[in-house]
Every structure is written in structure tokens, then in C-alpha cells.
Amino acid sequence: MAGLSIIFMGTPDFACPTLTRLIERGEDVIAVVTQPDRPKGRGQKLVPPPVKVIAEEHGIPVLQPQKVRAPEVVAQIRELNPDLIVVVAFGQILPQSLLEIPRHGCINIHASLLPRYRGAAPINWCLINGETETGITTMQMDAGLDTGDMLVKRSISIGPDEDAQSLHDRLSLLGAETIDETLDRLQVGTLTREKQDDALTCYAPMLKKEDGLIDWKQEPQQIKNLVRGFTPWPGAYTTLDGKTLKLYKVSVATECGKPGDIMAVGKDGIIVGCGSGSLRIEELQLEGRKRLSAQDFLAGCRLEPGIRLGH
């Protein structure tokens, strides 16, 4: 069967395995729509989105509109007349006028088991909330926020120490596998739609840096889940002598002490009281310094029992 003519819309690393899979399948990817190049680093040099790099390597035309809902952009996409638009972490909301263009509509790859965790940061919030399972849902897009009919779901278990980076990487690969199954079913006419039950939904809003502030009165597992969900960005944090201290890896310890008080230090980590127990800090970063193991951190920063973290 001849490949579908597809416009791919996506921007970050998460979207790359799916674009690569579409190319490998022999689908006719007629254009890639992505965000504009952004200035990065100290020199503020313009850096292309990862998806653009892959598209250019394969000679696929790239569109980078400031606003995809602009009438001239919609007209440009309509002129391309795609069979299907595949959307993965694009970063802009698509207008109804664009959703109606392809004969097979627009299919989105969403990094949760819908209807749970609609929104911009499902990977982070499922970790923060202590979920043990998540996955990928392909969805027939409508004008709402992740409210379209579900097509294919694939689930995976979440490791007890897994952070947002490792879960992101696994789900990005699972997304490519899920689009495989979705397109296979579409092309043989066995793709079915399932309505979302709005009563079962919860939301995963974009992370704000201030949401990562650690409350040492919370229970150890709650704080550990916050750290997992905020690693590597934007980082769960506390303060030490007025400086921001980001925590990247922690484990639940057995000691009990006052919330925020350092109870013990050693090569295995820094034990801090919290809730009705304690946490062991294993990787951390003080403002202005590199991310280090607790052992390396202690070699350059003297900490003693009784010092308090946070306000």
C-alpha cells in the first residue's frame, strides 16, 4: 500500500523518534512544521529545534511559523493537501480550520493514558503524584485540550526511582511504536475511536519553577516524588544559607528528625528530617556550582548535623 502523505508537527527531542519512524515506514512526509529557531546559551546563538535537524537531513521541507493559526499558514498547509497530520509535542494549539484539512484528520501522540493527565506536562505530574503506570495514547484531535477520541493505548510501568528524564526517553520511543500500530490499523481500516470519560480526567499543567520548592513538613515519599518529577528541569529545590540548593536524587531513609534539619552526613548521602521520617540526598547542586554526588559535594562544602535546609 502506498504511503500516506503526512505533515508532521513537532518540536523537541521527544518528537524525534516518531518522525524518524514515519520516514522509516516509507510514509510520504511532505513537510515538517516546527517552532522557530530559538537563541540559547551565553552567546544567544539561534538553535534549530531537534525535529528540524532530522527533517533537513532527509530533505523534507520545514515550516517554522510564529503562529500556526495565522490564516496564511493555514492556507499554506491546505495547499499541501495532506492525508494526515501527525502531532507530537508541537507547542502550539491548532485551530479548527487546520484540524479539518486532512482527510484522516490530525492524530496526536500524548504521553499519558488518557483521559488522565491532559495538558502540557503529563510525564512530570504522574511522577509527582506517585503513579506506578503511565503510557502513550494516540488521539484523534479536536479543538479541546487533549479531549479527542482515543485510538491506541500502550502502557508501561514506572520504576520506583525513575525520574522525568528517563521516563521521557522511554515514552518517546513508545510513542514511535504506538504511531506504528495506529497507522497500520488506519491503513487496513481497523482503527476504532473511543470517547474519553471526562469524569476520569486530571490535568498536568506546565511546570512552574516555584512548584519545585520543597516543603520539609511533607512525608519522605512525597518529597522524593517531587524530586523525580522535577528532574532534570526545572529542579526541586530548597535553600542553604540563603542559596538555592537543587536536589536531583534522593531516597527514603529510616531516621526521624525535625523537618529540614540535617541529621547525618557521609559518603552515602546527607540525611535530612522530613514529615514523620527522613530523606537521603544523593545528588545535588548548590547555586553557582555543578551538579554533584553527595560525596563530592561534601568534599567542597562542609555540612554538619543541626544545619537547617529551607526557611
From Swiss-Prot:
Q: Where does (6S)-5,6,7,8-tetrahydrofolate bind?
A: S112, L113, L114, P115
Mind telling me which InterPro entries this protein's record contains?
Answer: Fmt, Formyl_trans_C, Formyl_trans_C_sf, Formyl_transf_N, Formyl_transf_N_sf, Formyl_transferase-like_C_sf, GART_AS, Met-tRNA-FMT_C
Q: Which UniProt keywords apply?
A: Protein biosynthesis, Transferase
Reactions accelerated catalytically: L-methionyl-tRNA(fMet) + (6R)-10-formyltetrahydrofolate = N-formyl-L-methionyl-tRNA(fMet) + (6S)-5,6,7,8-tetrahydrofolate + H(+)
Enzyme class name: transferase
According to the UniProt entry, what is the EC number of this protein?
A: 2.1.2.9
Q: Which GO terms describe its molecular function?
A: methionyl-tRNA formyltransferase activity
PROSITE patterns, from UniProt? GART
GO cellular component, as recorded: cytosol
Matching NCBIfam families, A to Z?
A: fmt
Q: What does this protein do?
A: Attaches a formyl group to the free amino group of methionyl-tRNA(fMet). The formyl group appears to play a dual role in the initiator identity of N-formylmethionyl-tRNA by promoting its recognition by IF2 and preventing the misappropriation of this tRNA by the elongation apparatus.
- Spell out the family assignment given in the record's similarity comment: Belongs to the Fmt family.
Protein's UniProt name? Methionyl-tRNA formyltransferase
Q: What is the lineage of its organism?
A: Bacteria, Pseudomonadati, Thermodesulfobacteriota, Desulfuromonadia, Geobacterales
